[in-house]
């Protein structure tokens, strides 16, 4: 009977927690809206008055993985919603955010997410000037082409970085796809730019990538604070793996020790797949099969 009572209490607490969570919008808490407003203000300074900036957020994930926003879109908005768009008008320094509409059925399983219906809340959390559904974006783009001079449209011409990704590795992957005669994959950014040029040929398309790259090199105090926290977690994970090392352990088990420390302390995952190499495997700088003996490890 005691076991049944405990299970019932836990079940009721779980249900109550789940019901409370349904009314909470999922949003990052590391940066205030002023941080993103400041970044967008610097973009306006770089592109000038006769320009618009159009940024495409990451698509939804396939399969049972957690969505992660692209680095570039998150850097300017903090928004972690799939299929979002950002439009910045250099003429009047206004910013419009475009989100999908609420999917009540999906939210019953995944929790409440930012949507086009959450105007006041989204503006408060992100500091943007306007919120619209994504279907409004084509109409708003056409407004810039009613009369010349037409503004220059800035967007990403390089692949956007996602979870555990870097641009050099993404470019290597695209090069491999191009060399495969059976793989006709085109980068999502390439398809987006082609769509812009087809639908709105009056726009001169320019690359936003160098501007964001230069901005992201210089870290704000809040970014430095997060980097220090992540570095401390990396050190804690390495120390835990070292303490756990003993004869007979496999590489993947040591990898799991460090990852446990990351996750239990609030990290969403690794910056990259750990390099946990033992024996002769340690000679390979980016080895990740994790099935040898003596260990050389890199975690982040």
Cite the ranges covered by each PLM segment:
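Structural signal for well-ordered, non-membrane alpha-helices
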Residues: 235, 239-242, 259
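C-terminal helix-coil-helix/basic helical segment that borders enzyme active sites and/or dimer interfaces
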Residues: 30, 239-249
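Hydrophobic alpha-helical segments
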Residues: 16-19, 291-293
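A composition/biophysics-driven feature that prefers long, compositionally simple stretches
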Residues: 2-5, 10-13, 19-236
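Short catalytic-site patches enriched in acidic/histidine residues
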Residues: 61-68, 73-75, 194, 206-213, ...
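Juxtamembrane/interface motifs at transmembrane-helix termini
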Residues: 107, 116-118, 246-248, 273-275
């Amino acid at each position: 009977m005691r076991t049944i009572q405990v299970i019932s209490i836990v079940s009721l607490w779980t249900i109550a927690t789940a019901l409370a969570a349904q009314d909470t919008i999922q949003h990052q808490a590391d940066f205030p809206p002023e941080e993103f407003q400041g970044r967008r203000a610097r973009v306006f300074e770089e592109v000038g008055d006769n320009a618009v900036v159009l940024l495409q957020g990451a698509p939804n994930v396939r399969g049972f993985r957690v969505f992660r926003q692209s680095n570039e879109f998150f850097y300017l908005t903090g928004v972690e919603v799939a299929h979002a768009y950002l439009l910045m008008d250099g003429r009047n320094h206004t910013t419009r955010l475009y989100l999908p509409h609420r999917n009540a059925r999906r939210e019953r399983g995944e929790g409440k997410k930012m949507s086009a219906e959450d105007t006041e809340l989204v503006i408060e959390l992100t500091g943007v000037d306007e919120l619209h559904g994504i279907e409004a974006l084509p109409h708003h783009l056409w407004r810039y082409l009613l009369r010349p001079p037409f503004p220059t449209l800035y967007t990403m011409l390089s692949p956007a970085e996602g979870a555990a990704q870097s641009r050099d590795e993404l470019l290597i992957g695209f090069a491999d796809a191009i060399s495969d005669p059976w793989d006709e994959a085109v980068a999502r950014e390439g398809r987006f730019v082609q769509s812009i040029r087809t639908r709105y040929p009056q726009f001169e398309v320019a690359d936003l990538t160098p501007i964001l790259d230069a901005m992201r090199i210089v870290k704000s105090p809040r970014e430095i604070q997060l980097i220090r926290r992540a570095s401390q977690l990396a050190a804690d994970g390495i120390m835990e793996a070292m303490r756990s090392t003993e004869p007979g352990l496999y590489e993947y088990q040591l990898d799991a020790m460090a990852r446990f420390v990351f996750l239990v302390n609030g990290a969403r995952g690794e910056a990259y797949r750990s390099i946990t190499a033992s024996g002769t495997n340690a000679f390979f700088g980016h080895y990740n099969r994790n099935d040898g003996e003596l260990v050389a490890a890199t975690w982040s």
